[in-house]
């Protein structure tokens, strides 16, 4: 478990104690004459979400005082506004609720969402589902509306309640930021932003538009509006516009950090809506999906019962349940009905409706209740997500820092600095080459050191020597018999002809030349690849420098391969001279005799290698005698070659080759007029380094923001 996870319960305990004290204050306020806008005492919350996740303790029943337009809900229309308690409640609210939303908004403003998902509420719905009307009612501003695709870019709607301050807005996209002085500017500026980002047509863009609204008449809420789901392309729309929109929506709603707000009109079959189907696909248990029913005034008479069942979570269950709202209709928009008046009409609609009045009493209806509910859900969601978010930011920061380290430092602009930069690069490369030569290079878990790779070929060389020796043993009888028939002169039986012995030795030696040279070529390729990989590691981002080093590796390899090959050929030419020190040879011959004639340490009873010449126990045939000498000499020669050939390969291809490469690298520093050319960097590397620096900056700022937030929570 991370430190962030371990420390969080302590913060939460502190937080809950503050919430309990706040709850006592709320109880005091509720004992006073109800202030303007409070709900009637008999109002209860719908069971479909009350029992699943309780609201944070600091979101009290007086919460609607702080939401839309300060409109009163039914049951309390005449009381004067209690400014004292409301102001105190707002201060407590600002201390406990607003910081969570501000924290996530600040992280989103830093661009942290490019690196990891942040807690959010995303609004999805089919075209003409009433999605824009719901957002208008929440924000108090007119958003783009009409037929077809209206929302063409994700819109982050940041609502911040500021009592006693004038309305203010700001829209941001790409490198543009525009201050808005009037709500009437919003729709025009969003249209303009969408045209810049998605083109003057009907295409879509994945880039975000940020709309921030500060007003005394909005709830504290951040919500992401996504394009409406289109089933078929019309007009000049791309033929795959439906797939594009679904891919964009899925990118947001599949994140575990996102609460999905699914808008469904009452006059359609809820089970067939594409939006709810997409939400179910990414959230099959309905843990983070809230259903919003719209247009209750357009449904057929007599079907109200089915809608009540949906809102009560009896038809298509969601753990977070449903809400129902009535926003401005098209005719009301044409008649310029204000949003404030629309909210009043909505409350009147539910209050006077014979079937839906019960939903109002249960707290499942009206936009003000929806605003309250969404803020509570968002705050709870943020609280749950913060420990994991801290850990993700820490891990992402660490990973980006490591990637930046591998990219290396920026290339200096001054010639003198370029020289020092190049010296450092070559120095590090030479140090790693030296480690390869000495068998001390650092390797990862599944990698093997260079020496071990070569050693495998050296082991195979011992097997080749043993196999060749066995072949000679098998042809001894044939060779001696050939001599007896063709070349024997006046020698008596049993006398070994030295020429026969020497001929067999020469053949044996000659058969080893090709395997030895083959082993050399394998070792050369292994070493060359190791040097090339090291060059890519150090100079891969500098294509000219890397090409120069690769050429030097190849040239030096060819030169030293030729030297090693010549030395191996010389070694085998020397092996044509049959020689061994008497003291050494006599010991080996004695040992071989014992192994052949007395392998178990017992006197030999019968040694007959040729039935044509029966011999007694005291005599030794020419076959046995020449076999003894060949075995003895081959044993000594194999021991010598088993070490000598690997010595030659290591000396020329590792030590000499590596040393020559290091010297050649230092010679590059003499070419001062080529520094700029050598240090030309691949554009991808420069771009990657810049992006990593930006990511590290974002994540550093995010860690700082989380640290400050956590310290405030603790204190």
UniProtKB/Swiss-Prot annotation:
Residues 150-152 are annotated as: G2 motif. Residues 294-297 are annotated as: G4 motif. Residues 1-14 have a biased composition (Basic residues). Residues 69-80 have a biased composition (Polar residues). Its main location: cytoplasm. Residues 125-132 are annotated as: G1 motif. Residues 623-714 form the GED domain. Residues 326-329 are annotated as: G5 motif. Gene3D superfamilies: Dynamin, middle domain, P-loop containing nucleotide triphosphate hydrolases. One of its GO terms (molecular function) is microtubule binding. GO terms for biological process: defense response to virus; innate immune response; receptor internalization; regulation of cell cycle; regulation of nucleocytoplasmic transport; response to interferon-alpha; synaptic vesicle budding from presynaptic endocytic zone membrane. Residues 225-228 are annotated as: G3 motif. CDD domains: DLP_1. Pfam families: Dynamin_M (PF01031), Dynamin_N (PF00350), GED (PF02212). Residues 115-387 form the Dynamin-type G domain. Belongs to the TRAFAC class dynamin-like GTPase superfamily. Dynamin/Fzo/YdjA family. This is Interferon-induced GTP-binding protein Mx2. The gene is MX2.
């Amino acid at each position: 478990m991370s430190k962030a996870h371990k420390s969080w319960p302590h913060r939460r305990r502190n937080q809950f104690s503050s919430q309990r004290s706040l709850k006592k204050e709320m109880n005091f306020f509720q004992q006073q004459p109800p202030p303007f806008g409070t709900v009637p005492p008999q109002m209860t919350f719908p069971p479909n979400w009350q029992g699943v996740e309780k609201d944070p303790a600091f979101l009290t029943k007086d919460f609607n005082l702080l939401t839309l337009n300060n409109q009163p809900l039914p049951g309390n229309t005449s009381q004067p506004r209690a400014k004292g308690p409301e102001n105190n409640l707002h201060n407590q609210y600002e201390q406990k609720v607003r910081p969570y939303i501000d924290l996530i908004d600040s992280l989103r403003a830093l661009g942290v969402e490019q690196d990891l998902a942040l807690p959010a509420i995303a609004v999805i719905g089919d075209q003409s589902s009433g999605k824009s009307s719901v957002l208008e009612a929440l924000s108090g501003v007119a958003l783009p509306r009409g037929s077809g695709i209206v929302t063409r870019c994700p819109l982050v709607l940041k609502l911040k309640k500021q009592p006693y301050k004038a309305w203010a807005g700001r829209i941001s996209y790409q490198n543009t930021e525009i201050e808005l002085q009037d709500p009437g500017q919003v729709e025009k500026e969003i249209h303009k932003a969408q045209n810049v980002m998605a083109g003057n047509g009907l295409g879509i863009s994945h880039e975000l538009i940020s709309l921030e609204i500060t007003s005394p008449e909005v709830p504290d809420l951040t919500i992401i509006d996504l394009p409406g789901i289109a089933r078929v392309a019309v007009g000049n729309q791309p033929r795959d516009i439906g797939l594009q929109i679904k891919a964009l929506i899925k990118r947001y709603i599949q994140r575990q950090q996102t609460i999905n707000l699914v808008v469904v009109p009452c006059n359609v079959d809820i089970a067939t809506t594409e939006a709810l189907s997409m939400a179910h696909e990414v959230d099959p248990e309905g843990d983070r999906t809230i259903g919003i029913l719209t247009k209750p005034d357009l449904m057929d008479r007599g079907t109200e019962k089915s809608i009540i069942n949906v809102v009560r979570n009896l038809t298509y269950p969601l753990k977070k349940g449903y809400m129902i709202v009535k926003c401005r209709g098209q005719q009301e928009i044409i008649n310029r009905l204000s949003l404030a008046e629309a909210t009043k009409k909505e409350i009147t609609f539910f209050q006077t409706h014979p079937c839906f009045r019960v939903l109002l009493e249960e707290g499942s209806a009206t936009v003000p209740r929806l605003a309250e509910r969404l803020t509570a859900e968002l705050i709870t969601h943020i609280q749950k997500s913060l420990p994991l978010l801290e850990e993700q930011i820490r891990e992402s920061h660490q990973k980006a820092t490591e990637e930046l380290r591998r990219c290396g430092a920026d290339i200096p602009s001054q010639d003198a600095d370029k020289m020092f930069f190049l010296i450092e690069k070559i120095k590090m490369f030479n140090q790693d080459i030296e480690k390869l030569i000495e068998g001390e290079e650092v390797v990862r878990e599944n990698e093997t050191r260079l020496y071990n790779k070569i050693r495998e070929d050296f082991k195979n060389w011992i097997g080749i020597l043993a196999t060749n020796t066995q072949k000679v043993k098998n042809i001894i009888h044939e060779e001696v018999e050939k001599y007896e028939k063709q070349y024997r002169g006046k020698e008596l039986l049993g006398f070994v002809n030295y020429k026969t012995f020497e001929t067999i030795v020469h053949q044996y030696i000659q058969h080893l030349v090709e395997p030895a040279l083959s082993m050399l070529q394998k070792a050369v390729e292994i070493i060359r690849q190791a040097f090339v990989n090291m060059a890519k590691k150090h100079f891969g981002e500098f294509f000219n420098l890397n090409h120069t080093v690769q050429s030097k590796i190849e040239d030096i390899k060819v030169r030293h391969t030729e030297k090693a090959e010549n030395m191996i050929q010389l070694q085998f030419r020397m092996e044509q001279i049959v020689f061994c020190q008497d003291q050494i040879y006599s010991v080996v011959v004695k040992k071989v005799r014992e192994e052949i004639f007395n392998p178990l340490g017992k006197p030999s009873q019968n040694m007959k290698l040729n039935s044509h010449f029966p011999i007694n126990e005291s005599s030794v045939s020419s076959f046995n005698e020449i076999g003894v000498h060949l075995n003895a000499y081959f044993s000594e020669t194999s021991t010598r070659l088993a070490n000598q050939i690997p010595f030659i390969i290591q000396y020329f291809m590792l030590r000499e080759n590596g040393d020559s490469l290091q010297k050649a690298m230092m010679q590059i520093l003499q070419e001062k007029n080529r520094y700029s050319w050598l240090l030309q960097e691949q554009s991808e590397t420069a771009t990657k380094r810049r992006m990593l620096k930006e990511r590290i900056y974002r994540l550093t700022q995010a860690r700082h923001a989380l640290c400050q937030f956590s310290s405030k929570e603790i204190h």
